[in-house]
């Protein structure tokens, strides 16, 4: 008969937690931390002997909370100012990190061409090839200046990580963490002379990709399609809609 005895809980992931029991107090309480990895098996050892008693501990489900504040709508220009469109409304199209945006008419399925006028924020006639890009985060131009920025690729992955909470074909899909609702609408990618993937939801990230390219989110227009953030990217001279984020 020992005055005291050690109790050790061993996890299949290598973790160990211990306590000590005694004849006077044979019940041992050992606090096991939440499991942030995959399911693990906990085995109980008393005085160095495996009791063959086990408990399975499932993976802790961490609720999704967006790490940034998302703009209520896409970036657009209205009345000579950079503003956000309504939540389910299309914004303007921008080359990668360009201050100049342009609108495209409905229906997008007709793959409309660039109409020759950009807003920066003043309306200016400009050939598509002459629209500068790569030097200005257009989100930073929303008042108060410097508050908003383009989302990183990781933030786009976070936004779409739980898929759609709602999906209406050809209209919108909803991403939400329960606190913020972010609607994505069909938009495509403009080359100036045509619109590629007009029914898909596409938007720029702030991250450059391969040489001359930038990373972006693409989400096809079906209920079962998965969001994809490209690693290599697409030409920075193409144009997409832009969503903005700011610090919480």
Regions found by a protein language model. Give the residues of each.
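C-terminal, surface-exposed recognition/capping segments
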Residues: 62, 68, 72-79, 86-92, ...
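Short beta-strand segments and strand-loop junctions that repeat across beta-rich extracellular domains
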Residues: 8-12, 57, 138-139, 143
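Extracellular interaction modules
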Residues: 22-25, 47-48, 234-240
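Beta-strand-rich extracellular modules
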Residues: 33, 45-49, 247
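Edge beta-strands of extracellular beta-sandwich domains
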Residues: 49-60
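Surface-exposed binding patches on compact interaction domains or structured appendages
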Residues: 1-29
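A short beta-strand micro-motif common to beta-rich folds, especially ectodomain repeats
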Residues: 28, 38-48
């Amino acid at each position: 008969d020992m005055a005291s005895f050690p109790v050790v809980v061993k996890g299949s992931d290598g973790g160990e937690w211990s306590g000590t029991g005694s004849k006077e107090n044979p019940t041992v309480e050992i606090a096991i931390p939440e499991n942030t990895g995959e399911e693990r098996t906990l085995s109980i050892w008393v005085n160095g002997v495996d009791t063959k008693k086990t408990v399975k501990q499932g993976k802790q489900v961490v609720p999704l909370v967006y790490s940034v504040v998302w703009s209520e709508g896409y970036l657009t220009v209205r009345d000579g100012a950079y503003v956000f469109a309504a939540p389910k409304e299309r914004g303007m199209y921008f080359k990668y990190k360009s201050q100049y945006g342009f609108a495209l008419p409905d229906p997008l399925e007709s793959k409309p061409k660039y109409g020759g006028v950009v807003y920066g924020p003043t309306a200016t006639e400009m050939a598509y090839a002459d629209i500068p890009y790569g030097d200005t985060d257009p989100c930073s131009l929303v008042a108060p200046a410097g508050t908003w920025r383009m989302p990183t690729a990781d933030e786009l992955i976070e936004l779409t990580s739980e898929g759609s909470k709602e999906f209406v074909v050809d209209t919108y899909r909803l991403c939400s963490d329960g606190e913020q609702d972010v609607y994505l609408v069909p938009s495509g990618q403009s080359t100036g002379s045509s619109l590629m993937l007009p029914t898909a939801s596409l938007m720029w990230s702030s991250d450059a990709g391969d040489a001359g390219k930038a990373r972006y989110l693409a989400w096809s227009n079906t209920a079962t399609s998965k969001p994809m953030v490209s690693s290599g990217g697409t030409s920075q001279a193409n144009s997409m809609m832009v969503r903005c984020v700011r610090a919480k």
